[in-house]
Structures are given as C-alpha cells and as structure tokens.
C-alpha cells in the first residue's frame, strides 16, 4: 500500500491542514484516499459522533468514500486515543488500526497527537507507522520552541527506524524566528516552511517524494 503518514510534534500543530493540502495537490495526478483510523474529541450530534478532522480530509479527496471508512473509530472523550477508547469500553488494538488504514488507492493517513502519542493498547503512533511501513511527513508548528520540538521528534522517529520524507514548519502567522535555518544546522532532513509564500517550493518537494515512494 502506497501512501504518506502525517504526524507531528503534538496536537494542534496543523496536521489536518497540511494533510488537506497534500490530498488536493496529489489528487491532480492520483486517486487519493484519506484515513484517520481513530479520532477522539468527536462531537456528539443526536447520538452520532462526528469526526471533525476526518470530515475535512474526506472533503479534500477526489474519490467518495463513506466517513466510516475514512475514520473507523470515533471517540467522544477529549483525551489520547488510547484513553478515549478505554473510556468508551473499546479494546482497540494496533491490528485494528492497521486494518482501518487499508486502501486500494494512494492513501494519506493522519495520526492523532504526536509520534509517541498512545493510540491503542500498548501501541503508539510510531508503532502504527512501522506496521504500515510508510514514510512520514512531520508537521511542526513554526513558533518559539519549534527547534526543540523538531529535533525531539526527529530523534524519536529515527530511534524507531522511521523514514521522514519531509519536515513541515507550519507557519500559521508570519514570523522572523528563522527556525528552518536553525533546524537545518542539526539534520539533513528536508525542511519546508509551509505558508502562502512557499507553496511552489512545497509542491516541488512533494512531487520529488512521490518518485521514491
């Protein structure tokens, strides 16, 4: 199964935003499906749990799949996927999540939280990435402290034997922190600032990634 796994340094760093853009970009030349195998903090609407991130990913795709296929495990508790599944009485396993990611098309998989966030019994996001054997797009929010977050995440990924295709510095607000320059002094991983002024460069690098997947 070919695809990319979107992970990050934590929650609310822009994984879904970057994943949406990747899906739309790749959909110009490929059939692309999206998977968010488990999502916590889902909104309860009349007894039905609504996975907000998964819905955004689904809308970005050029193929129409049921939301239950995009996100198989929807959880209400606002906590890690592991704890939220326990709160709901669900005994979620790594094998369950691997199966929930399967697709016949090129697939963009978005994890929950950071690389080492627990997502099932005795399983972290890094374990799911290993099981899927996918390269990682690592999203870091471009803010004060991003250098530390990036290097910690890179070290974690490498210690788990994961392949990082690209590190994305998600620049939500323009700044002059020069985080990309600082990170480049400590790693050979491809680093890309993600904002409206750097989209052409981002797209070129994504196309290069596709050549080696």
From Swiss-Prot:
Q: Which UniProt keywords apply?
A: ATP-binding, Biotin biosynthesis, Cytoplasm, Ligase, Magnesium, Metal-binding, Nucleotide-binding
Q: Report the leader peptide range.
A: none
Could you name the active-site residues? 36
Instruction: Summarize where Mg(2+) binds, as residue positions.
Output: 16, 53, 110
Q: Cellular component GO terms, alphabetically?
A: cytosol
Q: Which residues cross the membrane?
A: none
Q: What class of enzyme is it?
A: ligase
- The answer on whether this UniProt entry bears the keyword ATP-binding reads yes
Q: Which GO terms describe its molecular function?
A: ATP binding; dethiobiotin synthase activity; magnesium ion binding
Q: What GO terms in the biological process aspect are recorded for it?
A: biotin biosynthetic process
Answer yes or no on keyword Electron transport: no
Q: Where in the cell is it found?
A: Cytoplasm
Q: In the Enzyme Commission scheme, what number(s) does this protein have? A: 6.3.3.3
Cofactor needs: Mg(2+)
The entry marks the following residues as binding ATP, namely: 12-17, 53, 110-113, 170-171
* Protein residues bound to substrate: 40
InterPro entries xrefs: DTB_synth_BioD (IPR004472), P-loop_NTPase (IPR027417)
- Catalysed reactions, as listed in the record: (7R,8S)-7,8-diammoniononanoate + CO2 + ATP = (4R,5S)-dethiobiotin + ADP + phosphate + 3 H(+)
| Pfam families linked | AAA_26 (PF13500)
Specify the pathway.
Cofactor biosynthesis; biotin biosynthesis; biotin from 7,8-diaminononanoate: step 1/2
Its biological purpose: Catalyzes a mechanistically unusual reaction, the ATP-dependent insertion of CO2 between the N7 and N8 nitrogen atoms of 7,8-diaminopelargonic acid (DAPA, also called 7,8-diammoniononanoate) to form a ureido ring.
Relate the assembly described in the record.
Answer: Homodimer.
Q: In which family does this protein belong, per the annotation? A: Belongs to the dethiobiotin synthetase family.
Protein name as annotated? ATP-dependent dethiobiotin synthetase BioD
Its encoding gene is what? bioD
């Amino acid at each position: 199964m070919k695809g990319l796994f979107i992970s990050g340094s934590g929650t609310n760093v822009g994984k879904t935003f970057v994943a949406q853009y990747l899906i739309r970009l790749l959909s110009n030349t490929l059939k692309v499906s999206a998977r968010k195998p488990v999502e916590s903090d889902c909104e309860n609407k009349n007894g039905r749990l609504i996975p907000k991130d998964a819905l955004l990913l689904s809308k970005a795709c050029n193929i129409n799949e049921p939301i239950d296929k995009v996100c198989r495990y929807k959880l209400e508790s606002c906590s890690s996927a592991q704890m939220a599944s326990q709160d709901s009485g669900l005994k979620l396993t790594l094998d369950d999540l691997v199966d929930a990611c399967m697709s016949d098309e090129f697939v963009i998989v978005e994890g929950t939280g950071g690389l080492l966030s627990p997502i099932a019994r005795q399983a972290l996001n890094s374990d799911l990435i290993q099981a899927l054997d996918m390269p990682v797009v690592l999203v870091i929010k471009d803010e004060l402290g991003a250098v530390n977050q990036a290097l910690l995440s890179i070290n974690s990924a490498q210690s788990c034997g994961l392949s990082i295709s690209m590190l994305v510095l998600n620049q939500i607000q323009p700044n002059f922190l020069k985080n990309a320059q600082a990170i480049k002094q400590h790693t050979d991983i491809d680093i890309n600032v993600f904002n409206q002024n750097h989209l052409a460069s981002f797209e070129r690098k994504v196309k290069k990634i596709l050549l080696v997947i």
